[in-house]
Amino acid sequence: MIEVLLVTICFTVFPYQGSSIILESGNVNDYEVVYPQKVPALPKGGVQNPQPETKYEDTMQYEFHVNGEPVVLHLERNKGLFSEDYTETHYAPDGREITTSPPVQDHCYYHGYIQNEADSSAAISACDGLKGHFKHRGETYFIEPLKLSNSESHAIYKDEHVEKEDEIPKICGVTQTTSESDEPIEKISQLTNTPEQDRYLQVKKYIELYVVVDNRMYRNYNSNRDAINERVYEMVNTLNVMYRPLNFFIALIGLEIWSNQDEINIEPEVAVTLRSFGEWRNTTLLPRKRNDNAQLLTGIDFNGATVGLAYVGTLCRPTQSVAVIQDHSKRTSMVASTMAHELGHNLGINHDSASCNCNAGPCIMSATISNQPLSEFSSCSVQEHQRYLLRVRPQCILNKPLSTDIVTPPVCGNYFVERGEECDCGSPQDCQDACCNAATCKLQHDCDSGECCEQCKFKKAGAECRAAKDDCDLPESCTGQSAECPTDSFQRNGHPCQNNQGYCYNGKCPIMTNQCIALKGPGVNVSPDECFTLKQNDPECGFCRIENGTKIPCAEKDKMCGKLLCQEGNATCICFPTTDDPDYGMVEPGTKCGDGKVCINRQCVDVQTAY
């Protein structure tokens, strides 16, 4: 029996108060020096399947002192960092595309926490010494190896002691999108979700992320693909820590380096680059590599102080589930924070208003990118994110990677169901699952969990496992052959819903009033029909689509299918500003625009012929 090895390292600490040193993060004015000394710890319970010897342990612990106090940093390998079909792509000098599937099972990127501290977290690379950050007593500390010959010394320091690379505030290029005032947010927070909505929000969600590095950034790192790979791995590892509070798990499914030349025109005008990258994802990337979201890291200096841009509320869309980020700092944590910010826009989160705040430090969705990395989501962002998920329900985030898709050597007894295992309830001493054989990680009977599993056996065929949640949903029943409830199914498109106020469309009942509430908060209604007539030729509120930058007015019959108009108090004809997201503030597809008619492609057509 091979047991999981826990490693404890003791650090001798020598504070260097007031001294200065140049590290990878830049010039650090105050730091402590520690010398790791590896000490084997007592074996931990758990049964490990036979496997080849690995360079890095799955679980490690480090003991050291911070400000003279001993702490224990617990680390676990980020098992979800790479998807099984993770690939790396670069280009030969003659332009040939070269794609490989490198072995990433034995990687060196970890998440963790300080022992006995509930609010702690860590993201660490252990590839060549210890590099990353950890949160201790509400403060963030950074650690990295000191490049001294014949020495295992490391530096520990705070962000406040790192000299800023420049004093110019960095900004996001998304404009005219700000979280609503406190009043709507408070009203929303007081609303009670249905049990089905609560279940949906609590389900783990997954994003398979594809990262592209442009030619400028490649050359900025001396055309060293290994250096870029390590930098991107660190960024995505950190990105995961930031998104765990939202119950999102991000797996890197591909990394592409434009080593020969850029595959699109990358311009200083960030909106142009974003549009080109979205088109490239749709026409070139998706046909050869599946992904839920793609981000472009570029070495170009965007116009002004802008360092990133993304579409808002567009996750899973072929041309718009994208973001572009300037590699604006030597510090991976700073760029990772910008990646988190732009991904937040894709997830329907707008910029925080002045009334939004975070428990500690800056907020991720502040319009100004903070000089302090590793920020967190505000309560405003959480509310907006949940509202977006419940309104749009993007499907690509629910396809959890199979147990074979998350790459790691299988360990029976570590509570993770991995390749070759049917269940994993911990060690035989700890297992509380009567359906699982802890010694073999095999099921005793049919199943151990799932909506269609009862007392370790499949429920009989026909047993309802998911009730219809509304007029546009259908109930699901167990098949008798699986522990999982069948995939959610919906009423046919065009089925009347909500007392004939609308027609079902892709499992939802799109009604203009609900769309107004989603954008403005409770107490808002759709404008009267005369508003749509009055605003028909208004350049801001009366168009149906934008072609080559020109707003095309709606035809008379289609006036209810263009810009959404809402009523709030005495304001009867409110429309929403045009943003980089072409669908923001527009009437949703499938919305009822008359008796027996629905909006499709911004046109009001007969429901019988629409689907």
From Swiss-Prot:
Known EC number: 3.4.24.-
Keywords on record: Calcium, Disulfide bond, Glycoprotein, Hemostasis impairing toxin, Hydrolase, Metal-binding, Metalloprotease, Protease, Secreted, Signal, Toxin, Zinc, Zymogen
One annotated GO biological process: proteolysis
Positions annotated as glycosylated: N282, N548, N570
GO molecular function: metal ion binding; metalloendopeptidase activity; toxin activity
Gene3D superfamilies xrefs: Collagenase (Catalytic Domain), Disintegrin domain
Cleavable signal peptide: 1-20
Tissue expr: Expressed by the venom gland.
Top-level taxon of origin: Eukaryota
Domain Peptidase M12B: 205-401
Chain sites annotated for binding Ca(2+) 3: D473, L474, E476, D488
Residues of the propeptide: 21-191
Pfam families on file: ADAM_CR, Disintegrin, Pep_M12B_propep, Reprolysin
Disulfide bonds: C316-C396, C356-C380, C358-C363, C412-C441, C423-C436, C425-C431, C435-C456, C447-C453, C452-C478, C465-C485, C472-C504, C497-C509, C516-C566, C531-C573, C541-C575, C544-C554, C561-C599, C593-C604
Binding site for Ca(2+) 1: E208, D292, C396, N399
Keyword Hydrolase part of the UniProt annotation: yes
Cofactor: how bound: Binds 1 zinc ion per subunit.
CDD domains found in the cross-reference section: ZnMc_adamalysin_II_like (cd04269)
Family to which this protein belongs: Belongs to the venom metalloproteinase (M12B) family. P-III subfamily.
Protein name as catalogued: Zinc metalloproteinase-disintegrin-like MTP9
Organism: Drysdalia coronoides
